[in-house]
Regions:
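Extended catalytic core of nucleotide-activated donor transferases of GT-like folds
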Residues: 2-136, 146-154
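Surface-exposed cleft-lining segments at the edges of enzyme active sites
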Residues: 66, 170-175, 198-203, 311-321
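Conserved donor-binding/catalytic core segment of Leloir-type glycosyltransferases
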Residues: 159-176, 218
Length: 407
């Protein structure tokens, strides 16, 4: 079989337009010249029968991150179909952290049950192999995110950008045991920079892919850190304790909880993002008046220090390095937006003070960081160097090349 004849089925779940890398991976598979790819949205019920009829026709079946990142509800009807495949199965895994929304164990159990041939991890390879050690029939391969240069390119020259430092991220929940990103955003929002800088940092709103690209092109710089948590567990033991604690508190208050995958939550998934932004606040107030809490609000409101002291203080960190590079880092490089980032490993892809300006975790070198950031020559050299490096080795085309070579 020639590699150019790889018939590929790409399964994805389209119920959000906020995470741009979902579209970037899908586009990369669909446009790769060595694949004949068909993409199917598993959230559309009418596709189930078609996939069942044709599953034996594919050399490669790919489960993108979206099929298991937040729920297994949509992929569950495909479980028996995937077992009947003839081709190889590659399963990506979305959100490789322990969350009350969906357990890592349930994702691992699904992958084991369908006997995935390959597991594509966003984590460093050592961490991925540790996490999926029970999936003995699967090969764990490092497939971190990358750059889609068609979606994220340098449109506005750096000297013409109107925002000095801009950033977007949802607040990290306390149940991750990791407050680095929240602390980073809080520090930059409050620090008295001299000279003063124009900041646009927000943890309450997000962009779709095109909006995120436009925003980055307005920013000379952005701030970030590695994704994930130092407290990754295969059995979700700690987050289950936090979940039981949080639910017992709500019960004591006589409050009901809108839980994950309940009917109201399923309906909410399909509300357009712009409408969600409009109705979220009044809906939250209405639910509060009924003494009803949405599960995510409960975890957002948990105090980090109290949660850490109660649940994380006396447990060891993950035995392997479990934080990772994320799509946001590649998006910024694509738009030539200079990154100020906390020190970390970044999957050994990005090098400190070569591809980004490294900030110590206690922020003690902020003066030196800003001197480098405000030096226009240093700034331009860094973004150009990072851009050329990523374009040469770390686009989504390169990632799908690696998938093709597995066959």
């Amino acid at each position: 079989m020639r590699k150019s004849s790889l018939h590929t089925l790409v399964l994805y779940a389209r119920y959000t337009d906020k995470l741009s890398y979902y579209d970037d991976w899908q586009y990369a598979f669909e446009t790769h010249p060595d694949l004949c790819a068909r993409s199917v949205n598993i959230c559309d019920g009418k596709n189930l029968r078609s996939v069942k009829r044709s599953i034996g026709d594919y050399d490669l079946i790919v489960l993108l991150h979206s099929v298991n990142a937040d729920t297994l509800v949509f992929i569950e009807p495909y479980r028996s179909i995937l077992k009947d495949r003839k081709g190889k199965l590659l399963s990506f895994v979305g959100n490789e952290v322990n969350l009350p929304r969906i357990s890592m164990k349930s994702k691992i159990d699904f992958i084991k049950d369908v006997s995935a041939d390959f597991i594509g991890t966003q984590l460093p390879l050592e961490a991925g192999r540790w996490l999926y050690v029970e999936c003995r029939g699967s090969s764990v391969v490092a497939l971190p995110h990358a750059l889609n240069p068609k979606a994220f390119g340098p449109i506005i020259p750096n000297g013409e950008r109107t925002i000095d430092i801009g950033a977007r991220s949802h607040q990290y929940w306390s149940c991750l045991g990791d407050n680095e990103r929240n602390d980073l955003y809080g520090f930059f929002a409050k620090y008295p920079f001299i000279p003063s800088l124009k900041m646009d940092i927000d943890t309450k709103s997000r962009f779709d892919r095109s909006g995120w690209s436009v925003f980055l092109n307005q920013c000379r710089g952005t701030i970030s850190n590695e994704a994930g948590s130092y407290y990754l567990e295969r059995d979700d033991a700690t987050v289950r304790k936090i979940q039981a604690f949080a639910e017992s508190q709500q019960k004591e208050k006589g409050s009901k909880i809108v839980k994950p995958d309940s009917l109201p939550e399923r309906l909410w998934r399909f509300v357009p993002s712009q409408l969600k932004e409009v109705v979220k606040a009044p809906l939250s107030r209405f639910l509060k008046s009924l003494n009803v809490s949405y599960y995510s609000d409960i975890y957002e409101q948990l105090d980090f220090n109290e949660t850490f002291e109660r649940f994380f203080k006396d447990i060891p960190r993950c035995p392997v390095y479990s934080k990772a590079i994320s799509s946001r880092h590649f998006d910024a490089i694509g738009t030539k937006t200079c990154q100020i980032m906390l020190e970390g490993r970044y999957n050994e892809i990005l090098k400190a003070d070569e591809h980004f300006i490294a900030l110590k975790h206690d922020f003690s070198n902020i003066t030196e960081v800003m001197i480098r950031f405000l030096d226009s020559t240093c700034h331009q050299v860094m973004v150009d160097r990072a851009y050329e490096y990523i374009m040469d080795q770390h686009t989504y085309r390169h990632r799908v090349d690696a998938v093709r070579d597995l066959m």
